[in-house]
């Protein structure tokens, strides 16, 4: 994808939005994908969530399943001074009420800040 972007007429307007769960579904190393996008100047936005490897899109709370890779991702983003958007693309359980959904979202942010 990054190589293709460089061939576009207005490549400066195009970046990537990597998502933890999508890379895990493919069995890829998310940190490598993020580092490549950062190095190319194309890391515009990032979706933080979690899931088991090689499964359907589960959208679990960030750091819920793979805490060590989540730690190294946060470390990378903070070390390089990433200033772009961090989106927690995670889904609370369908049986949760409004307050539980807010607690779930706070939990995603708390995990990021702890790491």
Model-assigned labels for residue ranges:
Residues 1-115:
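Histidine-acidic metal/acid-base catalytic patches
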